[in-house]
Design a protein with these regions (language model features):
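Serine-esterase "nucleophile elbow" of acetyl-processing enzymes
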Residues: 1-40, 50-59
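Ser/Thr-centric signal marking residues that sit
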Residues: 6, 43-44, 81
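Acidic/histidine-rich helix-loop elements
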Residues: 10, 35-43, 72-76, 155
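A short linear-motif detector with a strong N-terminal bias
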Residues: 15, 43-44, 135-136
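Alpha-helical cap/lid subdomain in secreted, periplasmic
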Residues: 30, 48-179
Length: 179
């Protein structure tokens, strides 16, 4: 469950990190079906409102939550973002799923204090709910010395070249959950 970073925004269908994850699972002889419930532009509030129906419909063993970036870009209250992430993790766990939370960072123009608080919210949710966490989903992309090579012209959405890196950021932590 995610936003445009997982919904293949601006990419050729089948080239995003979630599609690459399905291929990786097959290569590893792990028979899991991946359901991409990501919507471009989604916030944690949107994800929270959709999650119960998705859990009921798909009855997943694992839920990856990649949300929060749009909350930050829209300047939504941090407490609301954290509460929504916490609620989603709890709901997924109550439905019997293991949760993997993908952390994000705020753009630097929001100031260092807000950026630290935003990043800390993901750690707090993971600690409170005892979920797995990828601290920064865009590690090696958003913090690359030459980040423009990894982004579409809008400088927000990772391009096709970044997708394998995004999967590489998720895979080690997810693989531990799948065993």
């Amino acid at each position: 469950m995610g936003d445009s970073l997982s919904a293949e925004y601006g990419l050729t269908r089948g080239t995003g990190w979630v599609a690459l994850l399905q291929k990786k699972l097959a290569q590893e002889n792990l028979s899991f079906e991946v359901v991409n419930a990501s919507i471009s532009g989604d916030t944690t509030s949107g994800g929270r409102s959709r999650l119960a129906a998705l859990l009921k419909k798909h009855q997943p063993n694992h839920v990856i939550i990649e949300l929060g970036g749009n909350d930050a870009l829209r300047g939504l209250p941090l407490k609301m973002t954290e509460d929504n992430l916490l609620n989603m993790a709890r709901a997924a766990q109550a439905a019997g799923a293991q949760v993997l939370l993908l952390g994000m960072q705020m753009p630097p123009n929001y100031g260092p204090d807000m950026a630290r608080q935003f990043e800390a919210a993901f750690f707090q949710v993971a600690k409170t709910q005892k979920t797995a966490l990828v601290p920064f989903f865009l590690q090696g992309i958003g913090d690359d010395p030459e980040p423009l090579k990894w982004f579409q012209p809008d400088r927000i959405h990772p391009n096709e070249a970044a997708q394998p890196r995004m999967l590489a950021n998720v895979w080690p932590t997810l693989k531990k959950q799948l065993k």
